[in-house]
Amino acid sequence: MNAHKERLESNLLELLQEALSSLNDSELNSLSVTKVECSKGKHHAFVFVLSQDHKILSKLKKAEGLIRQFVLQASGWFKCPKLSFILDNSLEKQLRLDAIFNEIAKGKDDD
């Protein structure tokens, strides 16, 4: 991955977190952005948010215009990528893996 793309994703992550915290919706402004992945042409960004509620995606879709406007004003960029919000389930996967490893460890202890 090139340094420019990494820097863009890092800046976008910070700006999106600020944008969400500035919204008047308590569900949205308490969300955490865990990761941002930009497309090759940097015209599209996949934004991973930490939430268990699938309804939050429709709220984020409705607020996308405000969020993009905030990013443009705060960054001074000429253009903001189109945003696609995705629920980040990596924590859930990690917890499942931990449970599996604990079961394996218990099985070895019993032997």
From Swiss-Prot:
Compartment list: Cytoplasm
One of the record's GO cellular component terms: cytoplasm
Coiled-coil segments on the chain, per record: none
Gene3D superfamilies referenced in this protein's UniProt entry, alphabetically: 3.30.300.20
Chief location: cytoplasm
Keywords: Cytoplasm, Ribosome biogenesis
The keyword Cell cycle appears for this protein: no
Family annotation (PROSITE patterns): RBFA (PS01319)
InterPro entries, per database record: KH_dom-like_a/b (IPR015946), RbfA (IPR000238), RbfA_dom_sf (IPR023799), Ribosome-bd_factorA_CS (IPR020053)
Cytoplasm recorded as keyword: yes
Gene Ontology biological-process annotations: maturation of SSU-rRNA
Recorded family membership: Belongs to the RbfA family.
Subunit structure: Monomer. Binds 30S ribosomal subunits, but not 50S ribosomal subunits or 70S ribosomes.
Function field: One of several proteins that assist in the late maturation steps of the functional core of the 30S ribosomal subunit. Associates with free 30S ribosomal subunits (but not with 30S subunits that are part of 70S ribosomes or polysomes). Required for efficient processing of 16S rRNA. May interact with the 5'-terminal helix region of 16S rRNA.
Protein name (Swiss-Prot/TrEMBL): Ribosome-binding factor A
